[in-house]
Amino acid sequence: MALMTMVQALNRALDEEMAKDPRVVVLGEDVGKRGGVFLVTEGLLQKYGPDRVMDTPLSEAAIVGAALGMAAHGLRPVAEIQFADYIFPGFDQLVSQVAKLRYRSGGQFTAPLVVRMPSGGGVRGGHHHSQSPEAHFVHTAGLKVVAVSTPYDAKGLLKAAIRDEDPVVFLEPKRLYRSVKEEVPEEDYTLPIGKAALRREGKDLTLIGYGTVMPEVLQAAAELAKAGVSAEVLDLRTLMPWDYEAVMNSVAKTGRVVLVSDAPRHASFVSEVAATIAEDLLDMLLAPPIRVTGFDTPYPYAQDKLYLPTVTRILNAAKRALDY
């Protein structure tokens, strides 16, 4: 075991997979000599050379399109988009080509590639460096979507994503890149895509989150415990496919659920989860599902902390559910 930040865990995952499998290549803006804007790919160019670690032009469409071509010809590319906000010039390639290659080729071709994206707010980056666009991806059939919150999960799920036979959008909470450290195994391991993590057991209320907001979700659960409320905490980790069984079992047990995300509220991913809970567990709910999200505005520069879900907002939502 070694104490790692998320950046270090991601770097270790890439290094191990490149050493293990010569088909794994890395491409993106500044991923080579500079090691990526957040240094996730630091040292890989020096170790594996320019044929496997490739700096690209500033063109997300080219990055995603090139990754698809590489994947179709037998490689396992890991493409980096500097910020999730920048994916939209490459959105057509991702949605129209990458996500649909297996389907439209009748299974003759697959797209075993990963598109890594630093996502979410909390770094005062404004509307071009703070968005959480996961709803766009989970709405696209053919993509798997991962959103990690810990170094341990980051390493295990990135390795699983690289080995997956289908395209994976891998969302990394930039706010947690270096603010969270934990012991991470140095040996090889993977975590299953599609399985949530039970962070805390409880019986009165279920709190569900993923990615950027998990520290606040866990802090809210701790505050509720001081008030005698037993809150169960689920970290979804994977948004597509999300862990239906874990969510339904937890909410059926507690009867109350608060869903937390830093994405805008309208048509958010947690709205889909809330709707599914309401449809399938209506007769077991003691209160309606309650969402705590970002706001339906462009991401602000000056009010970054007010945009993100706070512990206070989560506690207020929990009180509503408990008092219903």
Swiss-Prot record:
InterPro entries: THDP-binding, Transketo_C/PFOR_II, Transketolase-like_Pyr-bd, Transketolase_C. Pfam families: Transket_pyr, Transketolase_C. The keyword Oxidoreductase applies. Gene3D superfamilies: 3.40.50.920, 3.40.50.970. Substrate binds at residues 83-86, 129. CDD domains: TPP_PYR_E1-PDHc-beta_like. This is 2-oxoisovalerate dehydrogenase subunit beta. It comes from Thermus thermophilus (strain ATCC 27634 / DSM 579 / HB8).
